[in-house]
Amino acid sequence: MILLISIIVSTPSILKAQSCPIIPLIASINVHGTSNVHDWDMKATNITGELGLNGYKQINAILIKIEVKSLKSGNGIMDGKTYDAFDFKKNPYIVFQLTEISQSKLSDNDSEITLTGNLSFAGAIRKISIKTVGKITKSGDYQLKGSVPLKMTDFKMKPPTAMLGTMKTGDAVTIKFDVTFKG
């Protein structure tokens, strides 16, 4: 779905960052959209990623990769049309790479964290900002929750159609996520 960007972070300090693999059992990423017939949802089932921490255990690098063919709606025809819209043979992954992070405290436990980075989606790369709620869990893991609205056409995707064009998918989608990195 997205081209894998070979450099995790553009600065040398990030390349020296401690890297923590994502815990897939508690990674949840869903795509929600609409059509002229009904709303639809797809769940990502193959998610990988890394979290980079500086010497103060603060986040300074994030890379998340989703296999396009792991997006499942429960409807094989819709799944196939989605994979075609992503041109999955050329763009097998969706990738988000952090370039900037800002944080403000919401409570003793939660912080509002704005993640800015490059999202590679169907072969196009766009800079996006995502507002998340983040926290360090009691076990020392890093949890980020949030959602981000996107338009398929911003990534040069043609929203899928079915039944000879009578069923049309809306351009807007929302990606919802709850991702925990092992600390």
Locations of regions flagged by a protein language model:
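Bacterial Sec-dependent N-terminal signal peptides
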Residues: 1-21
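Low-complexity, acidic/polar, glycine-enriched regions of mature
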Residues: 17-183
